[in-house]
Amino acid sequence: MTKIASVANILKGKITVGETVTVRGWIRTRRDSKAGLSFLAIYDGSCFDPIQAIVNNDIENYETEILRLTTGCSVVVTGKIAESPAEGQAVELQANKIEVSGWVDDPETYPMSAKRHSIEYLREVAHLRPRTNIIGAVARVRHCLAQAIHRFFHEQGFYWVATPLITASDTEGAGEMFRVSTLDLENLPRTDKGAVDFSQDFFGKESFLTVSGQLNGESYACALSKIYTFGPTFRAENSNTTRHLAEFWMVEPEIAFATLADNAKLAEDMLKYVFRAVLNEREDDLKFFEKHVDKNVITRLKDFINSDFAQIDYTDAIDILLKSGKAFEFPVSWGIDLSSEHERYLAEEYFKSPVVVKNYPKDIKAFYMRLNDDGKTVAAMDVLAPGIGEIIGGSQREERLEVLDKRIAEMGLKAEDYWWYRDLRRYGTVPHAGFGLGFERLIVYVTGVQNIRDVIPFPRTPRNANF
């Protein structure tokens, strides 16, 4: 049986010239010469570039099938690897047998015909868009980054923990949650006071899709010392912007016996590790992004790796912004949450490097963040990167039960909803810290693709849950 070879392995020189192999993939383009030859560009998704197959007109099905091949048809091609005389490719496939696995019903109406399509149009055909250069490249980069994240944490002695997608806890206390219910919406059970009786629901209480795996992650960090979660999270935030998704993936490490400084160091080490990985492993895709999407993609990643992270207190950051002379759209004052324009000024213009802003006002941060001695700020941090602004948010967690209870009350939350989380402070409490990295935000930064809807396979946004 002939050896099955990926296009990537052939183009990387892992298949020797003269060897006969079978390539399985799809037609990107076909052109015919007057000399009785057809040139097929075949891709299989294993790398950015297709391989060129040279087809002679003496192949049995040349007239009946080869000359009918169009963009999108699937084929199984067997042939010999040969050095290519053409520019831009080292080898080609001299075909001696081609089987057509699947035809495109009507090439005239095929949504992915061989022409340039707008990124907006591609969102309307999300089930077919991975066949395009840009979305195929995004998918490979996404895979590379995910694998690098898992490798990094494994090498650092972390354990991966699967946290639940269905929860009764609001980690962020913002209330922007998707309710999970099996109740009959046309015949809702009611309490004596007329409220919906969730005790009759599937879980016996009001339940939601998770906004974060952090609280559950803390439980395991307080036993395994170093853990991370990596999975989908959900926010019912009615925002139709290039930066928001209703369903997205989060990377959330938690470390016991750790301070905010340990947290910042972990964030820096992780980001630099995954950026090195993508530069080493996905050079072909990054060159495409550099040429067609963002000319600074590769330079930005290399600069990030070679940068020392600046560190600054929130209060000092506000000072810098006030003295900048910039007319920001959102006015600056102590107590505000930094907007994207503020973050980018700090990273791109003032420090010209990644920067960790820490010790934020407690009133704009979550209840679980450790209260500082000043009583006004919490041990929170954001990692800001040139070109995007915030890329990571984290904190040292509040390990003191009495302080945690006070913060829960201040936020208008119910202590009984967090009984198990409070138990972690009652039984062998320990200083611990962690952060959250929005995975799609990371992909946006790496690829230069500006709309977050284009870096996740099937985006979920307000009034859009197609596919």
From Swiss-Prot:
E.C. designation(s): 6.1.1.22
Primary residence: cytoplasm
Catalytic activity: tRNA(Asn) + L-asparagine + ATP = L-asparaginyl-tRNA(Asn) + AMP + diphosphate + H(+)
Keywords for the protein's UniProt record, in alphabetical order: Aminoacyl-tRNA synthetase, ATP-binding, Cytoplasm, Ligase, Nucleotide-binding, Protein biosynthesis
Superkingdom, natural source: Bacteria
InterPro entries in the cross-refs: Aa-tRNA-synt_II, aa-tRNA-synth_II, aa-tRNA-synth_II/BPL/LPL, Asn-tRNA-ligase, Asp/Asn-tRNA-synth_IIb, NA-bd_OB-fold, NA-bd_OB_tRNA
Gene Ontology terms for molecular function: asparagine-tRNA ligase activity; ATP binding; nucleic acid binding
GO CC annotation terms, alphabetical: cytoplasm
Entry's Gene Ontology BP terms: asparaginyl-tRNA aminoacylation
Family, as annotated: Belongs to the class-II aminoacyl-tRNA synthetase family.
UniProt xrefs under PANTHER family: ASPARAGINE--TRNA LIGASE, MITOCHONDRIAL-RELATED, ASPARTYL/LYSYL-TRNA SYNTHETASE
Protein name: Asparagine--tRNA ligase
The organism of origin for this protein: Histophilus somni (strain 129Pt)
Gene name of this polypeptide: asnS
